[in-house]
Amino acid sequence: MRKRARIIYNPTSGKELFKRVLPDALIKLEKAGYETSAYATEKIGDATFEAERALESEYDLLIAAGGDGTLNEVVNGIAEQPNRPKLGVIPMGTVNDFGRALHLPSDIMGAIDVIIDGHTTKVDIGKMNNRYFINLAAGGKLTQVSYETPSKLKSIVGPFAYYIKGFEMLPQMKAVDVRIEYDDNIFQGEALLFLLGLTNSMAGFEKLVPDAKLDDGYFTLIIVEKANLAELGHIMTLASRGEHTKHPKVIYAKAKSINISSFTDMQLNVDGEYGGKLPANFLNLEQHIEIFTPKDVFNEELLENDTITDITPDKQ
């Protein structure tokens, strides 16, 4: 019996490129042995709804084609269910942090080849209160950049749009008094921002979590304490090289469970999208989602365990 695949795609991502090559993508997957269909999202929440429906229809494979926000919605549609389908990713967003972390090809057909090759690995995801994320959660004014940057600017200058918006927001930054409980530790004080990372790539910074593992059951927690603009600029420069972890204003730790609260209003960023406000409880769900990955993705820099398996569809 042929395996069934469902593509869930954002037609506006990547300058609408996926929509134009969709017929070729369907043919390529059909030739590889997948009975394939597609669904185009129209508004926020559509990808989650369709992922839930696809799960009920017992698809063997879901493919998320879009940015990190689309992938987040698909993960939220399947994360709570025991019979989760395997997940393929076609990175089509402005930054594609998760795709970068997995070393997925940036071209559509190359990403489909990864799916067809059939190598999968189990990766961690995070649970924040009642929703899920696959790459990062964060709080602080600067972390709002990804969802406050205008879409038009992103389409014109790509990832540089985030840097433009980030520099624009720097003067607005102020430290907030927060309480962060992480495993058996507590931080109580003023912080400019905090980040919980599951991968090594966040907001285009591929060395923000230089020792990230995708499957070890731990978040990487980064807290930037109260600092002036000069200190913050220095930290950001160091972060581009992965050298920020020893800065005196930076707390860098690993944790499985994290609770964050504040008496001050603080918005949250979840996989690059608005994620509500504090308080929040975070829990790492170890090796919870099975993702198609390149053959060479397993190495000590990315994965703690050799969890890769091979899947070959029936072409009959």
UniProtKB/Swiss-Prot annotation:
InterPro entries tied to this protein: ATP-NAD_kinase_N, Diacylglycerol/lipid_kinase, Diacylglycerol_kinase_cat_dom, Lipid_Phosphate_FormReg, NAD/diacylglycerol_kinase_sf, YegS/DAGK_C
Active site feature: E273
Domain DAGKc, residue spans: 1-132
Cellular component per GO, a single term: plasma membrane
Enzyme class label: transferase
SMART domains noted in UniProt: DAGKc (SM00046)
Catalytic activity, as annotated: a 1,2-diacyl-sn-glycerol + ATP = a 1,2-diacyl-sn-glycero-3-phosphate + ADP + H(+)
Amino acids binding Mg(2+): K213, D216, Y218
Cofactor(s) needed for function: Mg(2+)
GO MF annotation: an example: metal ion binding
Binding note for cofactor: Binds 1 Mg(2+) ion per subunit. This ion appears to have a structural role and is required for catalytic activity.
Annotated binding of ATP, by residue: N10, P11, T12, S13, G14, T41, G67, D68, G69, T70, L71, N72, E73, T94
EC assignment: 2.7.1.107
PROSITE patterns linked to this entry: DAGK
Record key words, sorted: ATP-binding, Kinase, Lipid biosynthesis, Lipid metabolism, Magnesium, Metal-binding, Nucleotide-binding, Phospholipid biosynthesis, Phospholipid metabolism, Transferase
S-S pairs: none
Pfam families: DAGK_cat, YegS_C
Origin superkingdom: Bacteria
Family classification: Belongs to the diacylglycerol/lipid kinase family.
Physiological role: Catalyzes the phosphorylation of diacylglycerol (DAG) into phosphatidic acid. Is a key enzyme involved in the production of lipoteichoic acid by reintroducing DAG formed from the breakdown of membrane phospholipids into the phosphatidylglycerol biosynthetic pathway.
Subunit structure: Homodimer.
Protein name as it appears in the record: Diacylglycerol kinase
Naturally occurring in which organism (per UniProt): Staphylococcus epidermidis (strain ATCC 35984 / DSM 28319 / BCRC 17069 / CCUG 31568 / BM 3577 / RP62A)
Taxonomic lineage from the root: Bacteria, Bacillati, Bacillota, Bacilli, Bacillales
